[in-house]
Amino acid sequence: MINGSIVALITPMNSDGTVDNKSLENLVEYHIAQGTDGIVAVGTTGESATLPAKEHIQVVQQTVSFAAGRIPIIGGNGANATAEAIELTKGLSSVGVEAMLGVTPYYNKPSPKGLVAHYKAVAQSTDIPQILYNVPGRTSVDMLPETVAELASVSNIIGVKEATGDLSRVSKLRSLCGDDFLLYSGDDATAREFLTLGGNGIISVANNIVPKAFKAMCDAALAGNTEEAIAVEKSMQSLFSALFCEANPIPVKWAAHQMGLISKGEIRLPLTELSSEFHGLLLEAMKNARIEV
């Protein structure tokens, strides 16, 4: 499966709110050229919460088409209604994704029992490998390692994206889930340490705009070259913070637009464009990360 540096890809939009397919193609080509190891299409950073199911599936399908087998695509299939998640999963099963990434159901705060039932139902609706996604800061539900371990016994549930930033979970997840279960960091600020503790890869927001540096950090960390990984990480530390000055993906879309990676920085309501008070902060962080704008 996919290890290393994976981008949680933004979904570029036109001024009228429709998906900008030309910019989407440019992003896919950019990441192939920069050496990114994989793309997550229409996850949280791809504004999955504001794309209706039909459009969601179309964007993933378009991303797969643009990639043309040159880089693996993971399709987001998360929803807070199990029936909707299954609808997305069935729709994505025929478009050519390598795997799917499903966030824990948000807002309705299911119990561990509910999480297990949800993910089992989704996994049973497809043969495509499934990756769990735990990000309690956005969903208000924390999927504990013990729950992940129970789900790891399902044949096509192959890994978890863990975005709590709690590094103690890496060893616990590895112990409970076994060596073959894939562990992905979903927190850029602690990602390098996550890898050195036994993680397999990073599904990153910052990777949208610093893919070459992120790839270098991942490769060094996975190879055990800790000093090299730390040196690369230092250049991006202020960026990791600045990209969350407002709700993701507001800052990263603004930054990508400043770099010319997408034609516009449009974002769908209820999110709005980056407040002007944060422009200087983000530009300074981009400069520190050696990003030219």
UniProtKB/Swiss-Prot annotation:
Keyword Manganese part of the UniProt annotation: no
Catalytic activity: L-aspartate 4-semialdehyde + pyruvate = (2S,4S)-4-hydroxy-2,3,4,5-tetrahydrodipicolinate + H2O + H(+)
Record's keyword terms, sorted: Amino-acid biosynthesis, Cytoplasm, Diaminopimelate biosynthesis, Lyase, Lysine biosynthesis, Schiff base
Gene Ontology biological-process entries: diaminopimelate biosynthetic process; lysine biosynthetic process via diaminopimelate
Highest rank taxon of the organism: Bacteria
Residues in the signal sequence: none
Known EC number: 4.3.3.7
Alphabetized GO MF terms: 4-hydroxy-tetrahydrodipicolinate synthase activity
Site feature: Part of a proton relay during catalysis: 44, 107
Keyword Cell cycle: no
Enzyme class: lyase
A GO term from the CC aspect: cytosol
Residue sites binding pyruvate per the record: 45, 203
InterPro entries cross-referenced by the UniProt entry: Aldolase_TIM (IPR013785), DapA (IPR005263), DapA-like (IPR002220), Schiff_base-form_aldolases_AS (IPR020625), Schiff_base-form_aldolases_CS (IPR020624)
Pathway: Amino-acid biosynthesis; L-lysine biosynthesis via DAP pathway; (S)-tetrahydrodipicolinate from L-aspartate: step 3/4
UniProt-annotated catalytic positions: 133, 161
PANTHER family, per the entry: 4-HYDROXY-2-OXOGLUTARATE ALDOLASE, MITOCHONDRIAL, DIHYDRODIPICOLINATE SYNTHASE
Role according to the record: Catalyzes the condensation of (S)-aspartate-beta-semialdehyde [(S)-ASA] and pyruvate to 4-hydroxy-tetrahydrodipicolinate (HTPA).
Entry similarity comment: Belongs to the DapA family.
Subunit (UniProt): Homotetramer; dimer of dimers.
Name under which the protein is recorded: 4-hydroxy-tetrahydrodipicolinate synthase
Species in which this protein is naturally found: Shewanella piezotolerans (strain WP3 / JCM 13877)
Gene name, Swiss-Prot/TrEMBL: dapA
